[in-house]
UniProtKB/Swiss-Prot annotation:
GO terms for biological process: branched-chain amino acid metabolic process. This is Aminotransferase lcsP. The lineage of its organism: Eukaryota, Fungi, Dikarya, Ascomycota, Pezizomycotina. The gene is lcsP. Its cofactor is pyridoxal 5'-phosphate. Its EC number is 2.6.1.-. Keywords: Aminotransferase, Pyridoxal phosphate, Transferase. Induction: Expression is negatively regulated by the leucinostatins biosynthesis cluster-specific transcription regulator lcsF.
Length: 387
C-alpha cells in the first residue's frame, strides 16, 4: 500500500477531538541499569500501565511538547519544526532531572507516531491538524525526592483545531497569581507551570475574557507571556512595521514565535526582542498571541482590573489585525505546502514500516560485517600461533 494513505473517511474534520480513535502511540523506556533509552515500540492501547507511586504523580516529574502535522496538496505529510521541539524537550527535561531524549530518537518517535496514524491527518483543504504530544516522565515505585530508576517517553497524536479559534480575543492580566519566579522553571514545558493557572483561566472566562496575560512576578512592570502562548506586539508607522517580543528567561521559548520573527524579517520588518514595559501596551498598533496550539491570533483588548486600564487594538472591529493576518496566512501556507518552505521548517514524514525494515537490514549487515571482521582477526591470530 502506498504511503501515506489517504485521510480516513467518515470523519467530520471540523469537529474532531482528542477522543478521535487513533491506531496507537510510541513508547521508549530509560532504566538506570542500561543508562539509555530503549528502541521505540508502537503500542495500540492508549492507556499506560504506571505504578501508583511513580514520581510523575506525586512530584510532577514530567515534561512535554506539542507539535503539529499537516497534509500537503500532493498528499505528503509534514511535521512542523520537530528539531526545535526536540531541543526544547531536552531543556525542559533538564529542569526536572529527567534524562534527555536524544534529538535523533525524538525525531524517529515522532515520525513513527505520525506515520502509523497517517490516515487521521486531515485532508489538505480541511480545517484542523494532527496534534502531536510527546511526554516524558519519571515512573516506578519511588517515594524519595531523588531521580528514580526508570523513565517513560511517549508520543501520542490526536486530531485538533485551533485552540482559541480565529476571532480576536479579549485578554485579562492576572494580578493574583504569578506563573513563574525568577530563576525558576518558567522556561520549561513542565506540568507544574500550567495546571496552577487553570482555575484563574476559568475564572477569567466566566468574567468574559478569552485569554490571560502574565506580568513578571518580581516587579509586575514587564510583559512576559500569555498563559497558553507567546506575546507579540506590533508598531505600525505607515510602511514601517516593528514586531516586539519580550526577552525574558522566565517564559517558554515559543517555536511559533520564533517562526513569526523569521517571517517578519523576511518581509523587511524590524524585529526587536527586548524587555516590554507595561506602559508600552498603549503604544502597540496590534497585539498577537502565538503558539503551536493557537498558531497566531489577534488580541482585541487587554484589561488590568486594579488600574481600570483597558487597551484596545486594531482588531477591535472583530477582524484579525493586518499584521496578524499577513503572518498567519504565510504560516498556514507554508505549513500546508501551498508556498515554498524557504526556511526548511516542514519535515516530510517517512513510511515507518519501510524505515523499520531498512533498519533491520542495516543492522543485519552490520552484524555480518562485525562477525566477518572478528573471524579474520581470529584467523590471523591462529596463523601467528602456528608460526
Amino acid at each position: 500500500m502506498a504511503f501515506p494513505p489517504p485521510p480516513r473517511t467518515g470523519l467530520d474534520w471540523g469537529k474532531t477531538s482528542a477522543e478521535t480513535h487513533v491506531h496507537g502511540h510510541v513508547e521508549c523506556r530509560w532504566t538506570r541499569e542500561t543508562g539509555k533509552w530503549s528502541e521505540p515500540e508502537f503500542v495500540h492501547d492508549p492507556y499506560l500501565r504506571v505504578h501508583g507511586l511513580s514520581p510523575v504523580f506525586h512530584y510532577g516529574q514530567e515534561a512535554y511538547e506539542g507539535l503539529k502535522a499537516f497534509r500537503a496538496p500532493d498528499g505528503e505529510i509534514h511535521v512542523v519544526r520537530p528539531d526545535y521541539h526536540a531541543r526544547r524537550l531536552i531543556h525542559s527535561s533538564s529542569l526536572v532531572s529527567i534524562p534527555p531524549v536524544p534529538e535523533e530518537l525524538f525525531l524517529s518517535c515522532v515520525n513513527s507516531a505520525v506515520g502509523m496514524n497517517a490516515d487521521i491527518v486531515p485532508p489538505h483543504d480541511a480545517q484542523g491538524m494532527l496534534y502531536i504530544r510527546p511526554v516524558v516522565f519519571g515512573m516506578g515505585a519511588w517515594l524519595r525526592l531523588e531521580p528514580p530508576n526508570e523513565y517513560l517517553f511517549c508520543v501520542f497524536v490526536t486530531t485538533a483545531g485551533a485552540f482559541h479559534g480565529s476571532e480576536p480575543l479579549d485578554a485579562l492580566i492576572l494580578e493574583d497569581f504569578d506563573r513563574a519566579a525568577p530563576r525558576g522553571t518558567g522556561s520549561g514545558k513542565v506540568g507544574g507551570n500550567y495546571s496552577p493557572v487553570i482555575r484563574w483561566s476559568q475564572q477569567a472566562k466566566q468574567d468574559g475574557y478569552d485569554i490571560t496575560l502574565h506580568l513578571d512576578s518580581q516587579t509586575r512592570t514587564e510583559i512576559e507571556e500569555f498563559s497558553t502562548s507567546a506575546f507579540v506586539g506590533a508598531h505600525v508607522d505607515g510602511e514601517d512595521i516593528t514586531l516586539v517580543v519580550p526577552d525574558t528567561t522566565n517564559v517558554v521559548s515559543s517555536v511559533t514565535c520564533d517562526s513569526v520573527q523569521q517571517l517578519a524579517k523576511s518581509l523587511g520588518w524590524t524585529v526587536e526582542k527586548r524587555s516590554v514595559k507595561y506602559e508600552e501596551l498603549s503604544c502597540f498598533s496590534e497585539v498577537m498571541a502565538c503558539g503551536t496550539a493557537v498558531t497566531l491570533v489577534s488580541i482585541k483588548s487587554i484589561t488590568r482590573k486594579s488600574t481600570s486600564d483597558k487597551f484596545l487594538y486594531q482588531s477591535a472591529a472583530e477582524t484579525m489585525g493586518p499584521c496578524a493576518k499577513q503572518l498567519s496566512t504565510l504560516l498556514h501556507d507554508i505549513y500546508k505546502g501551498k508556498i515554498e518552505d524557504e526556511f526548511g521548517w516542514c519535515v516530510k514524514v517517512q513510511d515507518p514500516v519501510s524505515l523499520r525494515k531498512r533498519k533491520a537490514v542495516d543492522d543485519e549487515m552490520r552484524q555480518v560485517k562485525k562477525t566477518t571482521l572478528n573471524g579474520h582477526t581470529r584467523g590471523e591470530q591462529t596463523v601467528q600461533e602456528v608460526n
